[in-house]
């Protein structure tokens, strides 16, 4: 896998620095932001604690019904997965609001920041990790890990096909005919 040039990473840092500058340039604004996020996390913790003792508790936040990543029923029925999901959604919502509500940022920088936040939050979604995705965890346990072995084999094949660069296959190339 080829590393990204440092200039791309520095561009992300510069963009996020402009957003952070707005939020951190005023102590009251920064404190208000921290208080809001802290309250959201404490509310989530309280909801999780009530559920643990058998009480019904309304979720702090729910995924969009169109978000296919969280359709498995265990995202709601299993307290661990439900907590991880809500924590992710609250954090993602906050990150998007930071960009949306930052004042004094030019439209181009805001668009870049929105794009970067979307990419990062999608990358860290609990649905992307074995231990925090109920479907993948179930399949891993049921197949004794064979699903992970197959996935790693396919990853190695994709890297080999790209000669060191990840070249993700989107279909079976043996079925394709030039013509």
Give the ranges of each region predicted by the language model.
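Amphipathic, low-complexity, repeat-rich surface-exposed segments
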Residues: 1-179
